[in-house]
Amino acid sequence: DRPIIHNFMGRITAFDHYNLGADLDISSWDSYPMGFLLDRVGADETAQAHYLRQGDPDFQAFHHDLYRATSAGRWWVMEQQPGPVNWAPWNPAPLPGMPRLWAWEAFAHGAETVCYFRWRQAPFAQEQMHAGLLRPDRSPAPALAEAAQVAAELAEAPDVGTARAPVALVFDYDSAYAWESQPQGADFDYFQLVFDCYRALRRAGLSVDILPKTVDPSAYKITFAPGLLTVPESLQGGLVVAGPRAGSKTEELTIPEGLGPDIKGLSTKVTFVESLPPFAPMALEGGGAFMKWREALETRDSVILHLEEGAPAAVRKGQMIYIAGWPDATGWRRLLDMLAEQAGLDLMDLPPDLRLRETDSHRFWFNYGPRAVTYQNITLPAAGVHWEVK
């Protein structure tokens, strides 16, 4: 018997990967950090310029964590970018060290295998401009030495295992379909909402498990469920942060009788919603803002966050928190700071280019920046990787 493996892609919500993954022995995906930065991450030009040769610092990790949840934890990188590709709007070469970093990041997130696409750059046909580990003349391309370095390092490395993360993040394909059908704003995108939350968690130094809405919140210090179309009654038993748009529709995409959010235990109703253009964010009292989306609330629950104008921005009843808008990065961080002590989370304030991944036994640090960075007495060069025993 041989295992059945299939490869997924980045930012694709056209089918439910959990359902397909349940029929596979191993899920895999195609990781093209630089190509994805320019054609699907949604980064502005400043970020694209800064990460042009490295890729977005969270996009690969997001998909590692997502696809780890689709086949009982078994996953590969089926295609890893080794150099310039042939299909992105522009196709730069990686910063030296990045092919090694991308591979180590995948292994730190639990990958069993990292395969490069491709072995040799073909001198013919439609992909002849797609780099490989070998040039068309069969001589080594720049990434070959880095792949060999990773192989040598792996041979000496201990088995680090995959630890349960302290926080969970719900990703739900039905919600993606629903908000694609009814965005109510030109830039309301479910993937982007969840990804913004993920980025905020990673900037705080947290490892994340991405899971379907069947997650057991009692297994995590906090479970985040932004934009979740319907909120099952089972989503309780631990601290949960839901919203915006969570529980706002039925499975038939109708407004619940009595209005949303249809979340067990909450005494809060959304009376109307408004989508916000990029030039009109709504400031939060104390810092941060809602962008793209805001909901007006009637509530008998405790208000834990206000808009600058005084209206409720987030409410809480017991272990359920509902946030009535799409927070910017500062807004997400304020919410995390508010909850961290009760949840028993130790938060960091990582430099923009630095990311941390914790395994059973080790901490892995990754510098996605084009320059060296120092944090907590650790200095990583550009495209640097560092690991230490916990």
What annotation goes with each model-predicted range?
Residues I5-D196, V270-G286, F290-W293, L305-E308:
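Hydrophobic targeting/anchoring helices
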Residues S28, P217-T230:
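Short, well-ordered secondary-structure micro-motifs within conserved domains or adaptor modules
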Residues W119, D172, K213, R245, ...:
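Cofactor-binding loop segments of dinucleotide-utilizing enzymes, especially the Rossmann-like FAD-
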Residues S139-P158, A200, I321-A343:
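Catalytic cores of secreted or luminal carbohydrate-active enzymes
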Residues V167, V208, T223, K317, ...:
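Hydrophobic, well-ordered secondary-structure elements that form the walls
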Residues C197-S218:
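A short, well-structured beta->alpha microelement
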Residues G227-K390:
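A conserved amphipathic helix/loop scaffold
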